[in-house]
Amino acid sequence: MPTIQQLVRKGRRDKIGKVKTAALKGNPQRRGVCTRVYTSTPKKPNSALRKVARVKLTSQVEVTAYIPGEGHNLQEHSMVLVRGGRVKDLPGVRYKIIRGSLDTQGVKNRKQARSRYGAKKEKS
């Protein structure tokens, strides 16, 4: 426990919080190259084959990123844009791939929440 005089001299140091998306190095998004595209199974109460990709970012860090939406065109060596955001039922997946940018196509036949999935407005 410091004395009042020690606090006057030095003050208290702020605690540094833990960054949830360290691989992005403080940027909102980061470009990367897919090294492996595969499916993974979720944690206990859920059951599915979730589409994920191993991505080597421009920050030289390799991360596992989730591919949102139905269907995708990604394969090895595809250029993708990665943002932060974890998938709750996939352990270790703390990033998501942005649909509709670089080599990633938007979701086909998407009517609602189109901007999240890079889908263009269909002509009526």
Swiss-Prot record:
Q: Where is this region: Disordered?
A: 105-124
Its GO CC terms are: small ribosomal subunit
Q: Which CDD domains match?
A: Ribosomal_S12
Q: Which Gene3D superfamilies match?
A: Nucleic acid-binding proteins (2.40.50.140)
**Record keywords, A-Z:** Ribonucleoprotein, Ribosomal protein, RNA-binding, rRNA-binding, tRNA-binding
- Record's InterPro entries? NA-bd_OB-fold, Ribosomal_uS12, Ribosomal_uS12_bac
Q: A GO molecular function for this record?
A: rRNA binding
Where along the chain is composition biased (Basic residues)?
108-118
Q: Which GO terms describe its biological process?
A: translation
Q: What subunit structure does UniProt give? A: Part of the 30S ribosomal subunit. Contacts proteins S8 and S17. May interact with IF1 in the 30S initiation complex.
State what this protein does: With S4 and S5 plays an important role in translational accuracy. Interacts with and stabilizes bases of the 16S rRNA that are involved in tRNA selection in the A site and with the mRNA backbone. Located at the interface of the 30S and 50S subunits, it traverses the body of the 30S subunit contacting proteins on the other side and probably holding the rRNA structure together. The combined cluster of proteins S8, S12 and S17 appears to hold together the shoulder and platform of the 30S subunit.
**What does the similarity note say?**
Belongs to the universal ribosomal protein uS12 family.
**Could you tell me what this protein is called?**
Small ribosomal subunit protein uS12
* Biological source species: Mycobacterium leprae (strain TN)
Q: Show the taxonomic lineage.
A: Bacteria, Bacillati, Actinomycetota, Actinomycetes, Mycobacteriales
